[in-house]
Swiss-Prot record:
Entry keyword Nucleus: yes
Tissue: Expressed in kidney collecting duct cells and in the nuclei of proximal convoluted tubule cells in the kidney cortex (at protein level).
Domain COMM: 124-193
GO-annotated cellular components: cytoplasm; nucleus
UniProt protein name: COMM domain-containing protein 3
Any single biological process term in GO: sodium ion transport
Subunit: Component of the commander complex consisting of the CCC subcomplex and the retriever subcomplex. Component of the CCC (COMMD/CCDC22/CCDC93) subcomplex consisting of COMMD1, COMMD2, COMMD3, COMMD4, COMMD5, COMMD6, COMMD7, COMMD8, COMMD9, COMMD10, CCDC22 and CCDC93; within the complex forms a heterodimer with COMMD2. Interacts with NFKB1/p105. Interacts with CCDC22, CCDC93, SCNN1B, CUL3, CUL4A, CUL4B, CUL5.
Function: Scaffold protein in the commander complex that is essential for endosomal recycling of transmembrane cargos; the commander complex is composed of the CCC subcomplex and the retriever subcomplex. May modulate activity of cullin-RING E3 ubiquitin ligase (CRL) complexes. May down-regulate activation of NF-kappa-B. Modulates Na(+) transport in epithelial cells by regulation of apical cell surface expression of amiloride-sensitive sodium channel (ENaC) subunits.
Main location: cytoplasm
Family, per entry: Belongs to the COMM domain-containing protein 3 family.
Taxonomic classification: Eukaryota, Metazoa, Chordata, Craniata, Vertebrata
Localization terms from the record: Cytoplasm; Nucleus
Keywords: Cytoplasm, Ion transport, Nucleus, Sodium, Sodium transport, Transcription, Transcription regulation, Transport, Ubl conjugation pathway
Length: 195
């Protein structure tokens, strides 16, 4: 399991009792799991009164590092002993390791389901449709009469056999920029396949 130096520093800061006391550590750990597993989770978990004494930059850094480590552990289906070994290397004490492992075991199935739903392949664009929209703003100060485009990309997701649509609105300049970038990407792919 490879983690960046930035993530490792965040995990080591989380292990430091001077930075995070026991209750702050438990709250941050639960917040990291909640932010990953609950789509409706808000940032209020980091606004808990027991976390107010911690610098917000350090708090967010450690929250992100914990979430990254949890995702990596779930991705590699790490067992308790491997998890413990890594946390010991990051200077975690026995109590924090136990809490981390317990929280991980309690959420392991949900985490694996979440990671499995993400898929292994990027969606493929199968079709595109567009229509012209005309934007008119009637205001004494600003008058905007310009065309806009509503673009819908039909994509195919190979892993889930679903066919979702991606819709967006753009100006003529943005659409020309998108078409130019797609042409460049197509040419790059053609060159790569000819090598």
């Amino acid at each position: 399991m490879e983690l960046s130096e930035y993530v490792q520093r965040g995990i080591q800061t989380l292990a430091d009792p001077g930075s995070f006391d026991s209750s702050a550590f438990a709250l941050l750990l639960r917040a990291a799991f909640q932010s990953l597993l609950d789509a409706q989770a808000d940032e209020a978990a980091l606004d808990h009164p027991d976390l107010k004494h911690i610098d917000p930059v350090v708090l967010k850094h450690c929250h992100g590092a914990a979430a990254t480590y949890i995702l990596e552990a779930g991705k590699h289906r790490v067992d308790k002993s491997t998890l413990s070994t890594y946390l010991e290397d990051c200077k975690f004490d026995r109590e924090r390791i136990e809490l981390f492992c317990t929280e991980y075991q309690n959420n392991k199935n949900s985490l694996e389901i979440l990671l499995g739903s993400i898929g292994r392949a990027l969606p493929h664009i199968t079709d595109v449709s567009w229509r012209l929209e005309y934007q008119i703003k009637t205001n004494q100060l600003h008058k905007m009469c310009r065309p806009g485009y509503l673009v819908t990309l039909n994509v195919e997701n190979a892993d889930s056999q679903s066919y979702p649509e991606i819709s967006f609105s753009c100006s003529m300049e943005q659409l020309q920029d998108l078409v130019g970038k797609l042409k460049d990407a197509s040419k790059s792919l053609e060159r790569a396949t000819q090598l």
